[in-house]
Amino acid sequence: KVKGYIDQGVAEGAELLVDGRELSVIGADGRPSQGYFLGPTLFDRVTPGMRIYQEEIFGPVLGVVRAASLPEAMALIDAHEYGNGTCLFTRDGEAARYFSSRIQVGMVGINVALPVPVAYHSFGGWKRSLFGDLHAYGPDAVRFYTKRKTVTQRWPASGDARRASFSFPSGQG
């Protein structure tokens, strides 16, 4: 199913920067593993009319949507029927605070490519991204009926020439 999203994104005109469809995994025995593997995929120039924008893809596929202004970007995100997660790359702390406090999604990344929180934060979205009733008893019931938001941020030191990292944080400098 995820490969179908990648195929659809290409067909609809998104710019495919990293193609994970032909990933080959070498097993412990040194031979190619048998199985179904899909590598990271990165699209640029994704637009709201594309299926890869409209649907949640639970696989290693990331789409970049460009907006001319912060209000335009926020309007696109808030109008979307799902509210799982979104990211903003900026050097403007005021814009980051404004964005993270007002955007209507459950997980926000500031200067991180994936707004996936560590285990003690909420993992989940708002709107149609939240399904099920698994948290309806005891202390989880309070959390279930409360809109929670996780904001993950990274602020490189001024003048830091390192390129943006698109991987999970590590202990390496």
Segments (PLM) and residue ranges:
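Cytochrome P450 fold signature focused on the C-terminal beta-domain
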Residues: L16-A28
